[in-house]
Curated annotation (Swiss-Prot):
Catalytic reaction list: [(1->4)-alpha-D-galacturonosyl methyl ester](n) + n H2O = [(1->4)-alpha-D-galacturonosyl](n) + n methanol + n H(+)
Gene: PME67
E.C. no: 3.1.1.11
KW Cell wall biogenesis/degradation (keyword) present: yes
Coiled coil stretches, renumbered: none
Organism this protein belongs to: Arabidopsis thaliana
The protein's name: Probable pectinesterase 67
């Protein structure tokens, strides 16, 4: 059996729309800008061009131009360039599709550290129904700031429901992605950081994402990729990483406990030797580990060895993990323009 055939058997690509299914779209294997534009189906657009060949030269000015209480999709096309600004999508401006020209081509960056995570963010999403494609978001705060009290340097703060990022990249040294609340979908994104660089209380699927670990000399012995905060069993939240890979230039934990019911799962993910043997830590959390839900399912690579895993770390079965790998974990069939459904 060839590699292509095996992949078809393992994965079922589901490309649907909240406005109805499309049989021809289901054959597509790439979630690109034309497909998303087709599914979002709007002719309302604003063009941002740093060279002055569009409607605005600033991303924030384009957002400001979206009507308050917007109830229909509008495309904000941010053409290639490095936009040195901080961007805020306020709560009263939902249904925005921010379309870049590709991560590495369309870049939004600032250099801001703060004692407060939200205050430091380069990019803030507080409006429901937000979709982004092909954009890099950076917080380039100097490394030296890491040794002061103003050491938070968030790239993106996501505090809204029904938010999706496709082929985007997030860069910072510390606390890169504040995935705060709501249902979120990250597809083939790149996320770089060192300490707690994906953190918050959200309900999120990270599908085929690259997690790159960089060095931070503040941390002895290691930093952590995730710090998911969950206070009770009733909270239907958690971070689920499906496929993708974890690699980098420093050692790291997959996650640390943040609250007694912290929930993070890595499934079918390549774990390089960057991942330390313990895998998980309760660093700074001094309560019981009984209700922590830190688990792995069919991960592979040198960092996936389980002999020395933390006592509470779970080696999940198919039955235990199946509901988390379903797009229904984030109710995605009702709001995502396109998604990938994992099949066993």
């Amino acid at each position: 059996m060839g590699h292509r055939t095996r992949m078809i058997l393992v994965l079922t690509l589901v490309v649907m729309s909240i406005w109805g299914s499309d049989a021809s779209a289901m054959q597509k294997t790439k979630f690109d800008a034309p497909l998303l534009t087709e599914k979002i189906a709007t002719n309302r657009s604003i063009i941002v061009d740093i060279e002055g060949k569009g409607d605005y030269t600033s991303v924030q000015k384009a957002i400001d131009a979206v009507p308050v209480g917007n109830s229909n999709w509008i495309i904000v096309h941010v053409r290639k360039g490095i936009y040195k600004e901080r961007v805020h999508i306020p709560e009263n401006k939902p249904f925005i599709f921010m379309r870049g020209n590709g991560k590495g081509k369309t870049v939004i960056e600032s250099s801001q550290s703060s004692v407060d995570n939200v205050a430091s963010a380069t990019f803030k999403v507080e409006a429901n129904h937000f979709v982004a494609f092909g954009i890099s978001i950076r917080n380039d705060a100097p490394v030296g700031m890491a040794f002061t009290s103003e050491n938070q340097s968030v790239a993106a703060f996501v505090a809204a429901d029904k938010v999706a990022f496709y082929h985007c990249a997030f860069y910072s040294l510390h606390n890169t992605l504040f995935d705060n609340k709501g249902r979120h979908y990250y597809h083939e994104c790149y996320i770089q950081g060192s300490i707690d660089f994906i953190f918050g209380r959200a309900t999120s699927i990270f599908n085929n994402c690259e997690i790159f670990v960089i060095s931070d000399k503040r941390v002895k012995p290691y930093g952590s990729i995730t710090a998911h905060h969950r206070e009770s069993a009733e909270e239907k939240t958690g971070y689920v990483f499906i496929r993708g890979k974890v690699y980098g230039i420093d050692e790291v934990y997959l996650g640390r406990a943040k609250g007694p019911y912290s929930r993070v799962i890595f499934a079918k993910t390549y774990l390089s030797k960057t991942v330390v043997p313990d895998g998980w830590t309760n660093w700074s959390y001094h309560g019981s580990t009984q209700n922590l839900y830190h688990g792995e399912y069919k991960c592979h690579g040198p960092g996936a060895e389980r002999q020395k895993r933390s006592d509470w770390a779970k080696d999940l079965t198919k039955q235990e993990v199946e509901s988390f790998l379903s797009i229904d974990f984030i109710d995605g069939t009702s709001w995502l323009p396109v998604w990938l459904q994992e099949k066993f």
